[in-house]
Structure formats: structure tokens, C-alpha cells
């Protein structure tokens, strides 16, 4: 026991277990003025935005009376987003279709980029590239945008009377109703971040253990769940906006 205690004390004194110095993951930053900008997220987000803009321009630059395959695909996506928005928001869904559609497409392409794009081959001074939604900064930003959107929807529809919802059906529920508005963005951000991070980690581990056959069905499952996560986020965002405009829980 004395020998073991001495060994542990020696290790601690030599600093081999300085927990405060341990970092989970590394990040690549740009210094802009007095601010540190998370470059990894910006780079991958710009790539996703470029993919969305480029594919949209290519598909609809010459609209045809008889739609082409690309035009048909984007019309189908638009109809799908309109249906989701109308179902969750109601008859006043029109102005919110661009917002819900942008959320869905950005998250969908971001999620798929983690599985389909070879981010790892791009070398950075620190850290590595991954899907934008694999970073908590991205998912929190998307969730906060959703929060701003449903507050704006409620205030624009009802004015200051929107805040009366916090004391309905009884003022006793005021703390719970306030807490609910904080838990919505938290649940949105952590659900998306956790699922995408876990999916990528599972694929990485399986590829390192069995690099040929086993990871392939897992990757297909990851693509499916990534699409579902994008749909869940967009659907919940639309539901929160519809709820704030209707004033019911």
C-alpha cells in the first residue's frame, strides 16, 4: 500500500494527471480584431451554403414549362416544406416557409455532409473539419434563431398581450411557463448535436475496427437518421411558431 501511495503521489507531483490541462478536442481559430472566430464551423458552413446555392441555381436557372428532373426535385422539396409549415403553423404559414425551409435544408445538407464529404483529408493547423451540426455552436445558434422567430411571431400577432400566456391558465404556472421558453432551445440544440456527434463517432470507431463491410450499413442508417433529425428540428420550429401565434400549449 505504501509503495502504491508513493507511486500515485509521484505521478501527481510530476503532473502526469493535470486534469485542468486536458482538452476534449481541438479547435482552429481565426483572430479578427479582438475576437476569436471558430474557423472550422465557418469553413464547413460556407461549403454547405455553397452547395445549396449552387444546386439551386443549376436546377432553376432555365425554368421549363415541362419541368426538368432538377426542377421537379426542388418543386417537390418546396411542396414538402410548405406542407410541414402549414400543418404546424396553420393558415398563416406563408411568410414562414422560407425560414422553415432554410432551417431544414441547411441542417439536412450539414448532417449528410458529415457522412458523404471527406472532411478529414483537409489538414488544419489544429483540429479537423466535420459537419457543421457536429459542433454545439452551430446547433445552439440555430436553436436561438428559432427562439427569436417564435417570439417575433407571437409579438407581431398579439403585441404585448403575447406575454399574458405566461400566467395562463393560472399565475401559479408563471415560473414553469418561463422555464419552458428556456428549455425549448436547449432541447433543440442538444438533441441535434448529440445525435450527429454520436453518429459520426460510431462510424469512426467501426471503421477503425472493421474497415470494410460493417461500417457501410451503419453509414446508411446514419444518413437516414440525419434526415430525420433535420425534419424533427424544422417541424418543432414550425410548431413553436404556430403555438406562439395561437397562444395554446
UniProtKB/Swiss-Prot annotation:
Please indicate if the UniProt record lists Plastid as a keyword: yes
Organism domain of life: Eukaryota
Q: Name one Pfam family in it.
A: ATP-synt_A
Q: Does the entry annotate any disulfide bonds, and if so which pairs?
A: none
Q: Where are the transmembrane segments?
A: 40-60, 97-117, 136-156, 201-221, 222-242
- Print the keywords alphabetically: ATP synthesis, CF(0), Chloroplast, Hydrogen ion transport, Ion transport, Membrane, Plastid, Thylakoid, Transmembrane, Transmembrane helix, Transport
Q: What membrane topology does the annotation report for this chain?
A: Multi-pass membrane protein
Q: Which GO terms describe its cellular component?
A: chloroplast thylakoid membrane; plasma membrane; proton-transporting ATP synthase complex
Question: Predominant location of this chain?
Answer: plastid
Q: A single GO molecular function, which one?
A: proton-transporting ATP synthase activity, rotational mechanism
State the coiled-coil residue ranges: none
Localization, per the record, is: Plastid, Chloroplast thylakoid membrane
Subunit structure of this entry?
F-type ATPases have 2 components, CF(1) - the catalytic core - and CF(0) - the membrane proton channel. CF(1) has five subunits: alpha(3), beta(3), gamma(1), delta(1), epsilon(1). CF(0) has four main subunits: a, b, b' and c.
Q: Which family does it belong to?
A: Belongs to the ATPase A chain family.
Cited function:
Key component of the proton channel; it plays a direct role in the translocation of protons across the membrane.
Q: What is this protein called?
A: ATP synthase subunit a, chloroplastic
Q: Which organism is it from?
A: Olimarabidopsis pumila
UniProt lists the gene as atpI
Amino acid at each position: 500500500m505504501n509503495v502504491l501511495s508513493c507511486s500515485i503521489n509521484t505521478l501527481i507531483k510530476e503532473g502526469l494527471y493535470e486534469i485542468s490541462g486536458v482538452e476534449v478536442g481541438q479547435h482552429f481559430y481565426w483572430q479578427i480584431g479582438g475576437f476569436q472566430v471558430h474557423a472550422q464551423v465557418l469553413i464547413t458552413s460556407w461549403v454547405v451554403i455553397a452547395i445549396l446555392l449552387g444546386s439551386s441555381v443549376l436546377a432553376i436557372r432555365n425554368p421549363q414549362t415541362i419541368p426538368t428532373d432538377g426542377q421537379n426535385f426542388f418543386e417537390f422539396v418546396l411542396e414538402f416544406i410548405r406542407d410541414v409549415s402549414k400543418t404546424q403553423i396553420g393558415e398563416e404559414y406563408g411568410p414562414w416557409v422560407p425560414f422553415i425551409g432554410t432551417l431544414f435544408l441547411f441542417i439536412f445538407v450539414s448532417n449528410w455532409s458529415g457522412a458523404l464529404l471527406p472532411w478529414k483529408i483537409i489538414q488544419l493547423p489544429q483540429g479537423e473539419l466535420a459537419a457543421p451540426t457536429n459542433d454545439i455552436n452551430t446547433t445552439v445558434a440555430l436553436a436561438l434563431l428559432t427562439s427569436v422567430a417564435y417570439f417575433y411571431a407571437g409579438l407581431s400577432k398579439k403585441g404585448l398581450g403575447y406575454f399574458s400566456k405566461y400566467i395562463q391558465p393560472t399565475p401559479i404556472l408563471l415560473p414553469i411557463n418561463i422555464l419552458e421558453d428556456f428549455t425549448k432551445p436547449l432541447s433543440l440544440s442538444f438533441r441535434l448535436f448529440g445525435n450527429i456527434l454520436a453518429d459520426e463517432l460510431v462510424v469512426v470507431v467501426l471503421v477503425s475496427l472493421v474497415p470494410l463491410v460493417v461500417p457501410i450499413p451503419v453509414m446508411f442508417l446514419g444518413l437516414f437518421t440525419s434526415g430525420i433529425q433535420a425534419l424533427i428540428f424544422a417541424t418543432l420550429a414550425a410548431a413553436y411558431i404556430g403555438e406562439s401565434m395561437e397562444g395554446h400549449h
